[in-house]
Amino acid sequence: MKTVLTVVGLLAFSIPYACQGLSPRVIAISLLILLFSYLMLLPSLKPLIATLADNPLLTLLMMYIAASCLWAEQEQTSSMLMVLKFVTFSTFGLYLVTHYTTQGCIRLLVITLSILSVLNLLAVVLVPSFAIHGGVEHTGLWKGISGHKNTLGTLSLLCFVSHVIYFFRGTRKALHVGFVLLNALLLIKCQSTTSLLLTSSLFMFILFILLFKRIRSVSLRGFFISSSCLLVLLGIVFAFSYGDAIASEFGKTTTLTGRTEIWQGIAGAIDSHYWFGHGYGSFWANRPSIYANGIRFDLTSSHSGFRDLWIDIGLTGMLATITLAMTTLFKFRIGKTDMYTWLTAAVFFLFIVLNNITDSRFLNSLAIYWIIFVVIVIKVQERHRQTVAEKEITTSIQHASITLETTNRTARKKEPRFPAP
């Protein structure tokens, strides 16, 4: 029953109609999930406190985001409700990491994403007027129950790459092939360029890691890494040299569909609250109009997660988040133990970091992205701490063994030797 309710909670955080906005429906769902998380965490306060203590930067960041309501520019009640939502999905993330192993957390996320992909397809088939974009913008493109083609693209991307990894694990291959094909269809029909590019990049990363793990020779591994780096470098040079031509082939421009113009337009909003931001959710809640190069943009985000962090919680909060992301990436180890679980976690985390460059997937979007971020940061730190402790124990044992052997040798040398009769 606990697992079912956990998946239901993750689904609620993955559907806009259940977690976005401040409608009575969203607040009621948030309160129910917060109550569930509280009841589950209450008997295990000791592991919770230990988890928070082992992740001081993440703990301080969450407290800082919640406290930003004190200087938020929107109406106080709305600001408090925004903080309530943040506390809800952060608490749910803490519940996940204290009650499930890394393998269990990743498994629950994959199950949730798989259910979402089926629901998105059913919505398109059964209620096309609701699940397919109409009007002038994005006409005919699929959005499913995700509310927007780009959101559908990101969720389908995560489901696609996770089932690719699970396919290589070697169990239930037919099931994983089915979900790979389903999410490939969703990615194609939503036509989210960012998601398609990230899917291709992460797919190549998965193949690189799996091939690298199969190579035993040190010299071959070195050749494989250097060749891969050379190919990536050539790809970057090619993209910079022929970026305009490549973008035009896909009906795009190097302004990233107007994103660079939007980023110019929000420069004033960042400068006016440079260090501490406007308060969590405050700036975009007022639906400001952004002007850049004579163009007016009516938006709910800057289409950049890092810039939205800067707007919401200032340079202080953004740098804390970047530090968390970088230290987590450096601590990642994909070893033989639970290799496929940790590879899935690494791909999810890379997606969060990369996607937030040109899209907003930290706090100003579905809560599932923040939950993934929190879960992986904590689990990587937990594994890193265990690895360090194991190394210290091994070193202590080796040191004690060497000391004992040295003592024994010294004792043998000091023993009196009597001549043979």
Question: Where on the chain are the PLM-derived regions?
Answer:
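N-terminal signal-anchor transmembrane segment
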Residues: M1-P43, L61-E73, I352-L354, A420
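Transmembrane alpha-helices of multi-pass inner-membrane enzymes
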Residues: I33-F36, L343-N355, R361-R409, P421
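Hydrophobic transmembrane alpha-helices and their immediate junctions
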Residues: L45, G170-K173, I206-F208, F212, ...
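Aromatic-anchored transmembrane helix interface
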Residues: D54-M63, E75-T98, V110, S117
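Alpha-helical transmembrane segments of multi-pass inner-membrane proteins
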Residues: C105-G134, S146-F212, T327, K331
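Flexible juxtamembrane loops connecting transmembrane helices in multi-pass membrane enzymes
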Residues: E137-L141, I145, V218-F223, L233-G265, ...
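A conserved mid-to-late transmembrane alpha helix and its immediate loop/hinge
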Residues: A184, Q191-S195, Q264, F297-F332, ...
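Long extracytoplasmic/lumenal interhelical loops at the membrane interface
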Residues: S248-Q264, G268-I313
